[in-house]
Amino acid sequence: CRALPGKGPMLHNHDTNETFVAMTGTWRASWQNEKGKLEHVDLRPLDLVSFPPGASRRFMNVTRGPKNRYSILMFVIGGNAPSAEFTAESMHRLERAGVWPPRRGRR
C-alpha cells in the first residue's frame, strides 16, 4: 500500500490472517477489541503486526512531515481466495458519502 499521511482504509475484516510491515514512514494499525473499543499500535520501518481471522482492523499513514510524501506499508493476506468485509459503521459512512450501494453506470 502506498498512501499519503492521514490516508488508509476504513475498519474491515478478513476471513484469514493479515500481516502488516511498515516499509517507510509511520503507520497506525488499529483493531476493535472484544468490547468494541478501538486500540492501536504505531509501526515504524520494519515493525510488524499480524491480525487473526475475523478481527476488525484498519491502518493509516500517520507520518509527520510533508503532506504530499507517500509512505509504503506491505501487507500479506493469507489464503488462496480471502474475502473482506467492512464493519457496519464503515458501511454507514459509505452510504452517507453516497458511494454505496453502487449506482448503475458509475464505476
Pin down the residues of each PLM region.
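Double-stranded beta-helix
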Residues: S56-R107
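Glycine- and acidic-residue-biased ligand/ion/polar-headgroup-sensing regions
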Residues: P5, D15-R28, Q32-E34
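Residue-level detector of short, conserved catalytic/binding motifs and their immediate flanks
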Residues: N17-E18, D47, R57, S71
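Short acidic-glycine-tyrosine-enriched beta hairpin
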Residues: T19-V21, N33-P53
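Residue-level detector of conserved, well-ordered beta-strand and adjacent loop positions
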Residues: L4, M23, R44, M60
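Conserved short histidine dyad/triad with adjacent acidic residue
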Residues: C1-H14, P53
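Short beta-strand His + acidic residue motifs that chelate non-heme Fe in jelly-roll/DSBH
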Residues: P9-L11, A29-W31, F51, R57-P66
